[in-house]
Amino acid sequence: MNKMVTIDPTHAATAEMTVNARVATDGAPLTQHPQSLLDLPPGEARQSLLAVHGILGSKLPPTSLAIYEAGGGSTSYLPLDVLRRAHVTVVDIDEDQIRTNDYAQETILGDVQTYRFPLGTFDLVICYNVIEHLADVEAALVGFCESLKQGGLILIGAPNPRSLSGVVTKHSPHWFHVWFYRYVRGEKTAGQPGHPPFPTFFHPLVTLSNLESFAKTHGLQTIYRKQYESPRYPEMRARKPVLAALIDTLARVVNSMLPGKTDVRHGDYHVILRKR
């Protein structure tokens, strides 16, 4: 479990912090960022998450916040200054994930595809590494939209189904995903209850272009979108350099056959949507 400390004695929220006072690539002390960001290897994933944090800091109201996290275990991807002034409500279908969550004020054992809140409840809905695991993404997104206040934001972080890693994930058995997490990423608890990888569906709305089309027809404006190299690549280059070199070579060959500047290593994306 990530190390957590209380940020505000008058607030029940806790947030991941580090005592290391090094400086992040955006010039801010690392203590201002959650452990989830600090754990990312240097590269596009970290840069995009820093950009996301900047947008959330500037676009969300400077007052207390109501946040709905759709699926939430022991890790928060929100900037600490947002968590300090937020009442976070987590909904997750996995009892183990709920049990390990220690930063939310309210945890609900439920299905984000069917669970509904009163209209206009939240300033921010965050769904991070979740929609790829849902069979009915549309139902979940409709619920997110309905629960959002006017001008509120939805942050989605998800894998790109059209990337190299997305195609492999979609067309390989779950046991292979567990093997990859254990022996390539070095996560010995992979596949155990409450630990990733979780079964993946890749509903059509996980594809970014489809997601943006859905957003447009449901009164949502895209204010940030970024496809970036999956952090798995720099991790592999450090842990398994021979395997990483082979995969990088394969990716370059595939890229050479694709139009434009397509990079099949862009395995993940961030998108922020604002309710008009």
Which role does the model predict for each range below?
Residues 82, 145-146:
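Short, surface-exposed basic-aromatic patches at helix termini and helix-loop junctions that form
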Residues 90, 133, 156:
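Conserved SAM-binding loop
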Residues 78-80, 100, 136-137, 165-167:
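Short glycine-/acidic-enriched loop or helix-start segments at secondary-structure transitions
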